Amino acid sequence: MISSVYFKRSALVCALAAAFPLAAQTEDTLIVTAKPDDSASAQTQGYSAKTSTGATKTDQPLITTAQSVSVITRLQIADQGANTVSQALQYTPGVYSSFGGGATRFDTISLRGYHGGDVDNLFLDGMRLMSDGGSHNVLQIDPWFIERVDVIRGPSSALYGQSVPGGVVNLTSKRPQFSQQGHFRLTGGTQNTKGAAFDYTDAINDQWAWRLIGMTRSSDTQYDHTREERYAISPSLLWQPDSDTSLLLRADLQKDPSGGYHGSLPLDGTRYAHNGRKLSPSTNEGDPGDGYQRREQIYSYEFNHQFNDVWSAYSAGSYTHTNVSLDQVYQVGWVGDSDMLSRGYSGSRGSLDAWSTDNRLRADFTTGELAHTLILGAEYHRFRNDLWTGAGNAAPLNPFTGYTPQTGHTITYSDNNNRRYYQTGFYLQDEMVWNRWHLDVSGRYDRIVSQQVSDTSGTSNRRSDDHISGRASLLYALDNGLSPYLSYSQAITPAMLPGADGTLLKPTTAEQVEAGLKFQPPGSSDLYSIAIYDLMQKDVATRDPNIATATYIPAGKVHSQGVELEAHNQITPQLSTIASYTWNRLRFQDTKDGTDSNTPQLSPDQMASFWARYQLPAGITVGAGVRYIGKQWADDANTERLPSVTLLDAMARADLGAWSTAMKGAYIQVNANNIGDREYLSGCYGTGNCYWGAERSVTATVGYDF
């Protein structure tokens, strides 16, 4: 039964409700200038997208997709000034991507309350982003290289294999175009932020096109003694000899000499005063010599061929190589009642090599009055991550007086090991259409192998699992633009955690039932949706309370129920809006650590957002947004709760070509996030490890588009 908290009045919810038009509303204001390419691989237009490949791996209209799918377009990313994927998702329902606060080293994304790491829910161009969440070898893609972000909410293992129960996030790279386009920009702002970026594409001839994208950015960040620095470039080449065949080659190269801050502070001293004083949001409990360096290389191809009116083929593959170096001093709590923080040291060196491929055949045919889109696919993923890890002690620190020269750290433990992962999957899907009925049935078999080998101790732990995942959905598309639907789906997520005997635990599984209603006024790109879901994850790993060492037992469930609303609309040719609301109820069940009926940490009970963009005369565009993050528990024991927070963002852009034809294509844009500079805790991993939210930031961009 949905709690009465769902009906709590708020201005954001009212704004969302007001955004829903009546089904019978006329379309006199619709202005059509040209028919754009609506395919999911094409360049996005405005704030709305009509299609997505995320839920079905086929180019499917969102209005007839029986699953919750949100699309963040290129314009939305640019208008909101997102510098990370996590920031790009802040106005998306069912997603909490801000719990890392001002720490932006990794894209921390929670979907429908499940934050299963930075590996199992991130995909690039439809293939898994080959990170290792069990180490610090986690990749990050800069939004400057992204055309769109598709968020597919709900279990998705029937097509993608290993994934978290809450869904997957698919990043679509910018592609070469057969027309000349260029984008150049310089950026500066608070925290000594500086950056430059370019993006140029053109045709070589009628069969070949190329694109070259690059960027650099640096910042002193909001934390003392830390710095972020990035250099990245991506060349790509497209061969399209005819309308039936295409081959895309791409490389993504990135170097992060400084990965910024990724520490945490106790709740006592942040949420509450410690000995009468509170720690500043700029507090860094580490040492100035701490460092995180990351190098990424991704080489990929994508091939499409249409054999005839029925059969077509798709093949994609990638090779990934990453190197990571980490030296970090971190706090482990107050020393008694003193002002000193006890600290430890963690070090890591990692080199990861990964291969990934996805191949499928597609058949479009009819049997009587029933139209079919059938796909048969095979995937293979593997990585090997060679690691050195070290741990030890570091000198205590008084965070109120700041860093003073310490005696350094001592390494008391080190290990040379490697982590290996293999996944082989075969999947089948049939999308059937009869009149207005849309039935989608899919299934997948996966063999997942996880292995950890310690070269130091000579031990090896290996686990192999076979699993079948399924999905079925039914949707009815009415002529007036309404589409009610019902779906059932499953997920599998390997745990890779050690049990008492040293063996790895079996994967967790999940299943969901979702019902929803979508509305798209005929002839428009506006889209309004509501979804209600019931999602259960089983065999969740729980720390064994009877053993002092870090061992786990497969016990417990996490039950997620919720309601999500979303609206993307073009109210007038000048005014575009995005609105969302999320109510999410999470509970532990059947646990062995005393947390039954508790709510997991990092799970706000409500979230809401509203963003509006308005084009004024004389080339001026303004945008403003509000984000509400509801209350959340700081720990799984539910002993402390973080308060809700409301944050304001804004944007203003001046197209200088409206003032002088000599400056056509030039623009100036200013973005401000957390305008009120609210101090808040964005999330806690228990009461001992909390993150300050991102402080106010202001950036100015001077750019040129053609």
What are these regions, as identified by a protein language model?
Residues E302-S318, T322-Q328, P484, P507-Q589, ...:
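Membrane-embedded beta-barrel scaffold of Gram-negative outer-membrane proteins
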Residues P257-T270, R382-L387, V449, L475-F519, ...:
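Surface-exposed extracellular loop regions of Gram-negative outer-membrane beta-barrel proteins
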Residues R436, D534, P554-D636, G676-E679, ...:
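Gram-negative outer-membrane beta-barrel transporters
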Residues L238-D242, L352, A371-I375, E379-F383, ...:
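Structural signature of Gram-negative outer-membrane beta-barrels, strongest in the C-terminal barrel
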Residues M130-S131, H136, F145-E147, A158-I233, ...:
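Outer-membrane beta-barrel translocator/receptor signature
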